[in-house]
Amino acid sequence: MSLADSVLAVNNDLPIRTDKPVHSGKVRSVYWLTESDSRRLINDKGYKVPLDTPLAIMVISDRISAFDCIFHGEGGLQGIPGKGAALNAISNHWFKLFAEQGLADSHILDIPHPFVWIVQKARPIKVEAICRQYITGSMWRAYAKGEREFCGIRLPEGLKKDQKLPELIITPSTKGILTGIPGVPAQDDVNISRQDIEANYQAFGFESLSDIDLYETLLKDGFKVISDALAQLDQVFVDTKFEFGYVTDKNGQSKLIYMDEVGTPDSSRIWDGAAYRDSKIVENSKEGFRQFLLNHVADADVLLNKDRMPEREALARDNALPLDAMMNVSRTYTGVAEKVTGKTITLAANPKADIIAILKKNYGLID
């Protein structure tokens, strides 16, 4: 088995039966099933959703993105070995814990393969729900320049870089480009306040004002569940991004659920606890890869300056990263997954062939 063959880099070309275009994101691809296949699976598999619920196959890849670009490595390595399986395993673990502790359900109905989720269609909240327990990254850079108000929250004077904040804070941003909302620029990833959300809750996808309280509760409770569990592993849960949406349950009632992924090295910052106590930062998340890139390229401004996006895209496209750097990232992701779940992440010789075989034999989704 070659290392390159074990990586699933292209995940939008599987022969899954669908009558809609495949939606491809930076890491995942979504195949919406036909109405008849959705109904058949709901019946055959006993999924606890209404019969008319649209279902999708969500396939994760091993691609790695940073600074809005996809990077690759030497030797034809088009992604990070084990990354996709690690991300799914971590999310599966936290989603299960959330449900067991009575927080809320997720969009996942079934897990046919380490790279694959069967999900129900949700009506997404158009908010990136970001929770911070420490001041670092972009927040610290802004604070160091004199900013004190973040998303309507005022921080005290005298905070130090990487310090624990007095309390957990929520700093939401827009998900996608939203138009026609007073005071909110029509740009992706714009910081917003709770007041912005309350004044325009329907435009952000909330069905009621009270659901804003519920979303904040689920965000804080979910953060605490993950933070407490990671602390047992001597890991520090620094900050994270959650996503939420609505689904209709079997009784026809709308309910708020967790979506996308949670508590992963892609969506969170995680620090090594022993190193932090020694006043050092050891990143166990994608932040380590970002820092590597900033030190690796000749001109870091290319990665940071949005006005230089064409140069950045060319840099990512034309430069293969060292194999040892890619494998360091692999060890970070699989290491976190194995700590969190207690299970080994195994590389498959040909993950795409495995996925096709399972979806054909066990789910009848491939002709």
Curated annotation (Swiss-Prot):
Pathway: Purine metabolism; IMP biosynthesis via de novo pathway; 5-amino-1-(5-phospho-D-ribosyl)imidazole-4-carboxamide from 5-amino-1-(5-phospho-D-ribosyl)imidazole-4-carboxylate: step 1/2
InterPro entries: SAICAR_synt/ADE2_N, SAICAR_synthase_Vibrio-typ, SAICAR_synthetase_CS
Pfam families: SAICAR_synt
Keywords: ATP-binding, Ligase, Nucleotide-binding, Purine biosynthesis
Domain of life of the organism encoding this protein: Bacteria
A GO term, aspect molecular function: ATP binding
Single GO biological process annotation from the record: 'de novo' IMP biosynthetic process
GO CC term, one of those recorded: cytoplasm
Catalytic activity: 5-amino-1-(5-phospho-D-ribosyl)imidazole-4-carboxylate + L-aspartate + ATP = (2S)-2-[5-amino-1-(5-phospho-beta-D-ribosyl)imidazole-4-carboxamido]succinate + ADP + phosphate + 2 H(+)
HAMAP family reported for this sequence: SAICAR_synth
Similarity-based family: Belongs to the SAICAR synthetase family.
Protein name, per record: Phosphoribosylaminoimidazole-succinocarboxamide synthase
Provenance organism: Shewanella denitrificans (strain OS217 / ATCC BAA-1090 / DSM 15013)
